[in-house]
């Protein structure tokens, strides 16, 4: 591989890292005031507090400790796959939380959001680098996408 090709490859790799890092760091600063006020927890509103955090916490323990697919703690008893696949089972971010102890799950929401924003920026950069005039334009576009009002507003819908 020529020296010029290596430099171009390193520059592209730096674009991936830069997009991920800037978006994840921006998410940290977006959520930092909430972390300080709520002592490590991220309390939002509505379904996030009453569904998302309890679902994550419950299914974290269920996946680790349950023998079978039937959940007696959900309604009058139901299949966990049928009840939670929309919210959790299809999300790679949920599966990352299963690496943590169940008690830590509510405190892992902000790191998961940081990871999600970083991955959104990484994905946008991957797409935009093919169509932009240069790496910097692709990084700016990735940050604009990952930190857009659409993405920030939809933190409420944690399962997407």
Per-segment meaning from a language model:
Residues 13, 76-77, 137-139:
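Short hydrophobic "helix-edge" motifs at membrane interfaces and signal-peptide entry regions
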Residues 26-121, 143-160:
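Membrane-interface coil-to-helix junctions
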């Amino acid at each position: 591989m020529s020296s010029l090709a290596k430099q171009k490859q390193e520059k592209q790799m730096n674009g991936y890292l830069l997009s991920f890092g800037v978006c994840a760091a921006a998410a940290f600063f977006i959520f930092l005031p909430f972390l300080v006020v709520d002592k490590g927890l991220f309390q939002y509103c509505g379904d996030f507090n009453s569904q998302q955090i309890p679902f994550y916490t419950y299914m974290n323990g269920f996946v680790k400790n349950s023998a079978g697919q039937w959940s007696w703690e959900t309604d009058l008893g139901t299949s966990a796959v049928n009840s939670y696949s929309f919210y959790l089972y299809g999300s790679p971010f949920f599966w990352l939380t299963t690496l943590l102890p169940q008690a830590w799950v509510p405190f892992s929401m902000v790191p998961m959001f940081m990871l999600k924003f970083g991955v959104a920026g990484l994905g946008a950069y991957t797409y935009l680098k093919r169509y932009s005039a240069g790496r910097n334009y692709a990084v700016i576009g990735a940050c604009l996408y990952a930190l857009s009002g659409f993405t920030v507003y939809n933190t409420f819908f944690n399962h997407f």
